[in-house]
């Protein structure tokens, strides 16, 4: 599933990320990465990292509305359903 960012992310190399492809299937590694997060904020960032394939640094630079939207779109797939 593709998601168009509200605010594009500027990468260190000067390029921009404007669209993110959200995974619709997760692995045990993904569950572990999210489960090992320290709190609600960390777990939301971890979810967006595994769902998007972006680096944590890229996700930390995202607009909060985009982080929240991607997490909300990915969560149903993570728990076994569809959005």
Task: Give each language-model segment a name.
Residues 1-83:
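Short, surface-exposed, charged amphipathic helix/loop patches that serve as local interaction elements
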